[in-house]
């Protein structure tokens, strides 16, 4: 099991390779990354048998930026018939697993395999259970089978608490009909990724205040309003009437890069299409000056050297807060609903909850 297999957004295979090679260098795991363009996956081949396991044990999955899912294991060729027997034979060296996910890569070819996986899962699950290879126990490793075709599968293992929370890392979020734009799903997914669900009532409560920079027509404002927050929407464009009718939104025609609230707020969110360095500077200003407690900001990516640019910006942000003596937690992820961008979440660790004005 010396291969680490990772899912990603199509077109970002190179970024996954760069990021995982960085990780391997830090953890002193020898090997090499490889991927083909637009295949929505990448691999890191370790030269030592325990290399993939050391990579996974040495890194929290939710702190990786570009991989959507990961698993350590091996590729297996399958016959046209009796695939289950071949899989069971190969799994003889695997530990007993506590859950089973069948996955495909996020390409058109991968999506065509979804129906096959749905039909194949029940008999496979039954066979694994009868063979003693699958029990219902979240403390045990998760068995991840990624089908590249009906004749090739990656047999992988991952800890349930150190891998994606959804199969393939793709959330099952429903677009709310009353939301003014589909961008609303980006912020909802960000909350799922960066904030533990049992902390939502505390950190996304109805007595909070928020600012949405570049808000129009209100996709991200909608998420704040849905949690009951009072929101100041900053944009020279029009906001959706449905949001203004809630009485929870104040719309100010102003520049999102120069606006500052008179009183600190709990949340600042921003999805302005601008150079990433400029949006990153907003994070430094708002968190560093105590204008907000938490923030979600999207950084649009350049065409080339995307991982290097993200890493450079994150390092600069971190150094800026260290220079100010401000304690923050910093998270960054290319979410499923992101396109040529990544989403950053920052939280001040030394500021009390803002008073609602």
From Swiss-Prot:
A molecular function GO annotation: S-adenosylmethionine-dependent methyltransferase activity
Taxonomy, superkingdom: Bacteria
Lineage of the species this protein comes from: Bacteria, Pseudomonadati, Pseudomonadota, Gammaproteobacteria, Pseudomonadales
Keyword Transferase among record annotations: yes
Similarity section: Belongs to the class I-like SAM-binding methyltransferase superfamily. RNA methyltransferase RlmE family. RlmM subfamily.
Substrates-to-products reaction catalysed: cytidine(2498) in 23S rRNA + S-adenosyl-L-methionine = 2'-O-methylcytidine(2498) in 23S rRNA + S-adenosyl-L-homocysteine + H(+)
Organism: Pseudomonas syringae pv. tomato (strain ATCC BAA-871 / DC3000)
GO biological process annotation, one example: rRNA processing
Signal peptide stretch: none
UniProt xrefs under Pfam families: FtsJ, RlmM_FDX, RLMM_N
Active-site residues per Swiss-Prot or TrEMBL entry: 300
InterPro entries the UniProt entry points to: RlmM_FDX, RlmM_THUMP-like, RNA_MeTrfase_FtsJ_dom, rRNA_MeTrfase_M, SAM-dependent_MTases_sf
Subunit-level organization: Monomer.
Protein name, per record: Ribosomal RNA large subunit methyltransferase M
Binding site for S-adenosyl-L-methionine: 183, 216-219, 235, 255, 271
Record's keyword terms, sorted: Cytoplasm, Methyltransferase, rRNA processing, S-adenosyl-L-methionine, Transferase
Gene name for this UniProt entry: rlmM
